[in-house]
C-alpha cells in the first residue's frame, strides 16, 4: 500500500476513475449523469487505492460534475448510472433546470473573462503605442533657432575672381615714312614716331638739321626725317 503512486491533481483522479469505472466515468466526450449518493460508493470501493483520500475524491467529483461536458449530459429523460453503469433512475426536471443554469453561468463567466482579457490587451497595446509615439516625438529633431536680425553674420567667402580675358592687341596703324623733308610745308599735319607710337604734330619750320614741329601738347622740337611719318 505504501509503495502505490500518489495522484496529485483532480484531473489525475478523474482519469483514474474513468479507467477504474469506465461504465460510469469518462475522460472525454459527453458524460453520463451519476447516481445520487455516488460519493459514498466511491469511498467504499476506492478509498486507499492510489493513496486516495476522501478530500481528493470529493474535489475530483466536484470538478467532474461541474464540467461543461457533464452539464450537457443532464437532459430530460436521461438516466443516472452507478459505478458499474447500472441505471439508477431518470433525471428529475429540477435537476435538469439546475444543470442548465449552471451551464449558462459557466459560459457567461468565460465570456466575461475573455472580454476582460481583450480589454487588457487593448489597454496594453494602447499604452505601448503612446509610449512609442512619445519616443518618436522625442527623437524628432528640433528646428534650428532663427537668427536674430542684429546677430553678427559670418562673412561669406569671396568667390575667386574670374580670370581676365587677355585683351587683343590694338591694331597697329601703318604710317608712311617721310623720305624728303623738302616736300613738307609749314602748317602741315604730321606724326612724330616715339617708339611704337606716333604723336600728332604740326610742321613749324624746315631746317638743315631737320624739321621743327609742335606737338599737340604745345611743346616744340626739331625732329629728323627718319622719325617723321604721314
Curated annotation (Swiss-Prot):
GO terms for cellular component: cytosol. InterPro entries: ProQ, ProQ/FinO, ProQ/FinO_sf, ProQ_C. The keyword Ubl conjugation does not apply. Residues 146-155 have a biased composition (Basic and acidic residues). Keywords: Chaperone, Cytoplasm, RNA-binding. It comes from the Bacteria. RNA chaperone with significant RNA binding, RNA strand exchange and RNA duplexing activities. May regulate ProP activity through an RNA-based, post-transcriptional mechanism. This is RNA chaperone ProQ. It comes from Cronobacter sakazakii (strain ATCC BAA-894) (Enterobacter sakazakii).
